Amino acid sequence: MNKKAFTLIELLATLTILGIIMLVAVPNTVSLFEKNKKDAFISDAKRLVALAEAEIRNDESIDVSYGGFIVFSFSYLDDGSFESDPDNKPYDSANSFVVVYKRGNATSYQFDYYVQLIGSKRGLDLTLSKGIEPSNVVEAPKKQTITNAIKTVFNIASPTIVNY
């Protein structure tokens, strides 16, 4: 007998096998996309910090007292390279910024860089730049104002802030 079609059993077996493959492959693919979006978000946060570091190094008019804070707004630092967040929506420029904290004294001081970056679906609450990791990216960021974020992180009632 010359068969030119599949039997119902063969079709059901094939569909079952494809269904099992989909159950395994789809969640892995989705988690891979999420991981890539978080990595891109972290990359943007680090780039924002790098722009603030360059601004501190290159602009001698920027000065802050020891124990004081310089805040660079997202809008100030954006050189046009931040077209959109990893979800293809604009960053929340009103709630995204870099805080530079000058610690030490006249003979020995250091700048610590903190970043808060808020996107459309995820965000990074004010975090020390050295500790930025994908695990810091949250789905529902706090969207704190500059003053509240500094008060929360540094436990200071009324911080001295210089805005740029």
Where do the protein language model's features map onto the residues?
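Short, surface-exposed interaction loops/tails
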Residues: 101-164
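Aliphatic-rich helix starts adjacent to a transmembrane/signal segment
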Residues: 19, 28-49
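N-terminal alpha-helical signal peptides/signal-anchor transmembrane segments
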Residues: 44-63
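Extracellular/periplasmic head regions of type IV pilus-like filament subunits
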Residues: 60-123
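N-terminal single-pass transmembrane signal-anchor helix
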Residues: 2-29
